[in-house]
Structure formats: structure tokens, C-alpha cells
């Protein structure tokens, strides 16, 4: 390889989908002067996440459809403006490397309660337009004091960039009502991406993630809804987000010998290659099986149930017992929430009789292992064109001129 450094890919701000889902992504072909084989193995078609993530959940205080339309119009304009901003040159020191872009993405999703409240109220007359698979996240084995129903929200806003303080600024504008007074922030979670492709305990991660490497976009095939998927028409080009905040109790795990750590995951720690033979309750075998020549009751191969993972790590210090509070923000994007996400989680991972009767729980979630402590289901609509907002497909029309001055900061 030439003595050069690759410039990270930029988000896709002009495509039909919201930025921050299947982008930024490395091009399939290596730039001139780079070894195509090495590039193909390590970069081609892979997500190149920004360094920092804020997961912001919020409810809407709007009382009418008109007010909700105004809120979504303003939020859409705010997101566009933040993504289009160029880093100011007058704040950089004269001998620092110029910052050309911070690769900001602001990605908005709708929760089930926007369509029907927990109490069953169709407050905005949107129930008939609810995406087919969207619901409040169900309780599952592995939830540790987390009741998804109590944490269901109307909106999720994913803010990603290479600058932590940019994320904080955007969060502050939303939290303090500077974007729209009807946005009531419920929570914020902060995450970071490792510069390599390893997860918190040091294992190679993401080897089986769909790529954009060749031909029709395989990543998009797994992620974005099509006309034949039986969804409301406005959902075409959108995707589902299954978000879980997963706590990892690392002290116990790191006390295990390396061989036992690998047995928990079912893969080689350095390479990520699956161990053969592996234990039936190993994490890889439970959530990501690869059974040759196997088709299930719905005539689907295991590989057809994949989803796109976009993980970030968190480190929230120590809990009340003095134990470190760290783990993974597990963001999963899928075209069909039931087929691609709930089936692997409910029928495989948490099923004590998968892959064979008496297997037990996923080894990663064993005593002193992992636990779900947050999350939710959301629908991420397609990108809005310049004349519309993210709620236009819901029939929420708003008479407007330009972008509100309040969002242009």
C-alpha cells in the first residue's frame, strides 16, 4: 500500500434515506495507489461510523395535528441545518490541521406512542398510518430492571459526529427548547466508537455485518423497506430501529482465561472467525447461527434474517455498588422488525431450546454477564425532500415559507 492515509467517507446527505443509517460507508473500490485486496478485506463497503453518538429520546407536547406538523417541520429544518454547517475556520489555531468536516448526521425516528399512546389514545389521528411492525418494545429475558413500556417515547433523535462537543451543542438546543418548545426530551445516552473494529471486551466485531461492496446494495436490501413489503406507502425507503443499551459486567469476564472468553463468544478473539466445534450456547451460535442447507418453517435461510448493526460503547462510571457501568449501545436497523430482529432475539437468542433442546441461555447473558438496561423500537422514515418535512408522509401538512430562523444557529 502506498504511504498514504485514507480520508474517512462522508455521510450521504443527498440520498433518498436519512443520513446516519447506512452511511458513512467506504466505497467498494480502493482509491488509486492502495492495495485493492487489503482495502477490499478491511474497508470496502463497510460502515465507517462517526466517533461519537448521542441517543436522544423525546415526547411531543403538541395538542393538534397542525401543531405536530409545525414541530416536525422545524425539527427537519434544524437537522438539515446542523448537517450542512461547515466548521468555522476562525476558531482553529494557526498550526492545527484544518477541520473540513465533522461528518454530522441527525437521524429522526418515530416511536409507537406517536401513533397511539400507551393508554390507547389516537391523539393525532395517526393510528391508521402506523408502520406494520412498530410497537412498544416487549420485555425479554435479559432485561435487568428495565421495563420498555415505561421508557417508550414519541421520538428518537440520533446525533452522530466526529466531535463530541458538536453532539453536545445539538443536544443542548433540543433539551433547552431552542429548536421547538413542543419537544420534551426524556433521556440522552452518550456513546463512542473505538478506532478499530473491536467490541468492549476486545473481540473482533462486525465481520458478518452487511456491506455495500458489490452489485445491488446488499446493505440496503437488508435495511430499507420496499413497495412489496406490505407497509403503508409512506414507509417505503424507511427502516426500523431496534435500540438496546446492553450493560457488560466486564470484571467477571476478564477474570476468565482467554480460552473460556472465546467459548462464551464462540469465536476467535483476534480474528473473529468462528470456533469449530463451538458450544451450542455460545453467543455466535445463539444470535447468529450459520446452519448449512437449513431452511426454517418459513423457508428462510439463517443469512436472510441478518440486520445492520451500528454499535457504540458507553462508560457511565460506577453504579451505587461501586461496579463499573459500561457496555454497548446496540443500534440495529432492519427492513422487517419481526423477521430480521425479533426472530433472532426471541426464537434463537433467548430460546433455551435453541439450537437444540436444553441448550440454555446465551452464554454472554449468563450469571455476571450482560444485561439489557435500556432501549426501544422506532421507525426511521425516508429522507424528506426540500419542500417537505419528515412527517409529510403521515399527512401532516404545514403551510410554510422558509426554514424558521430559530433553527439556523
Regions found by a protein language model. Give the residues of each.
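Long, histidine/aromatic-enriched segments associated with O2/redox biology
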Residues: 2-409
Amino acid at each position: 500500500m502506498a504511504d498514504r492515509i485514507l480520508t474517512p467517507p462522508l455521510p450521504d446527505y443527498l440520498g433518498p434515506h436519512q443520513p446516519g443509517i447506512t452511511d458513512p460507508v467506504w466505497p467498494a473500490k480502493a482509491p488509486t495507489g492502495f492495495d485493492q485486496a487489503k482495502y477490499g478485506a478491511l474497508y470496502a463497503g463497510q460502515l465507517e461510523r462517526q466517533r461519537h453518538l448521542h441517543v436522544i429520546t423525546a415526547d411531543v407536547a403538541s395538542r393538534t395535528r397542525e401543531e405536530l406538523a409545525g414541530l416536525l417541520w422545524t425539527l427537519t429544518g434544524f437537522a438539515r441545518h446542523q448537517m450542512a454547517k461547515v466548521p468555522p475556520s476562525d476558531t482553529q489555531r494557526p498550526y492545527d490541521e484544518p477541520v473540513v468536516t465533522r461528518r454530522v448526521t441527525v437521524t429522526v425516528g418515530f416511536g409507537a406512542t406517536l401513533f397511539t399512546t400507551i393508554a390507547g389514545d389516537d391523539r393525532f389521528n395517526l393510528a391508521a398510518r402506523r408502520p406494520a411492525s412498530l410497537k412498544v418494545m416487549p420485555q425479554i429475558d435479559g432485561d435487568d430492571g428495565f421495563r420498555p413500556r415505561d421508557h417508550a417515547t414519541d421520538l428518537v433523535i440520533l446525533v452522530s459526529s466526529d466531535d463530541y462537543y458538536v453532539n453536545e451543542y445539538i443536544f443542548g438546543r433540543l433539551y433547552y427548547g431552542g429548536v421547538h418548545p413542543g419537544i420534551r426530551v426524556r433521556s440522552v445516552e452518550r456513546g463512542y466508537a473505538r478506532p478499530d473494529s473491536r467490541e468492549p471486551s476486545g473481540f473482533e466485531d462486525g465481520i458478518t455485518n452487511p456491506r455495500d461492496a458489490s452489485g445491488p446494495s446488499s446493505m440496503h436490501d437488508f435495511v430499507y423497506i420496499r413497495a412489496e413489503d406490505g407497509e403503508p406507502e409512506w414507509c417505503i425507503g424507511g427502516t426500523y430501529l431496534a435500540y438496546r443499551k446492553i450493560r457488560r459486567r466486564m470484571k467477571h469476564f476478564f477474570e476468565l482465561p482467554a480460552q473460556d472468553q472465546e467459548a462464551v463468544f464462540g469465536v476467535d478473539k483476534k480474528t473473529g472467525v468462528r470456533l469449530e466445534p463451538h458450544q451450542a450456547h455460545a453467543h455466535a451460535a445463539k444470535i447468529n447461527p450459520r446452519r448449512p442447507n437449513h431452511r426454517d418453517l418459513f423457508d428462510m435461510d439463517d443469512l436472510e434474517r441478518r440486520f445492520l448493526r451500528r454499535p457504540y460503547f458507553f462508560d457511565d462510571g460506577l453504579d451505587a455498588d461501586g461496579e463499573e457501568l459500561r457496555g454497548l449501545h446496540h443500534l440495529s436497523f432492519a427492513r422487517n422488525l419481526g423477521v430480521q430482529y425479533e426472530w433472532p432475539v426471541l426464537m434463537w437468542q433467548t430460546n433455551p431450546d435453541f439450537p437444540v433442546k436444553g441448550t440454555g441461555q446465551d452464554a454472554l447473558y449468563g450469571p455476571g454477564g450482560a444485561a439489557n438496561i435500556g432501549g426501544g423500537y422506532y421507525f426511521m422514515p425516508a429522507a424528506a425532500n426540500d419542500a417537505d418535512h419528515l412527517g409529510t408522509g403521515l399527512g401532516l401538512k404545514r403551510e410554510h415559507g422558509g426554514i424558521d430562523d430559530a433553527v439556523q444557529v
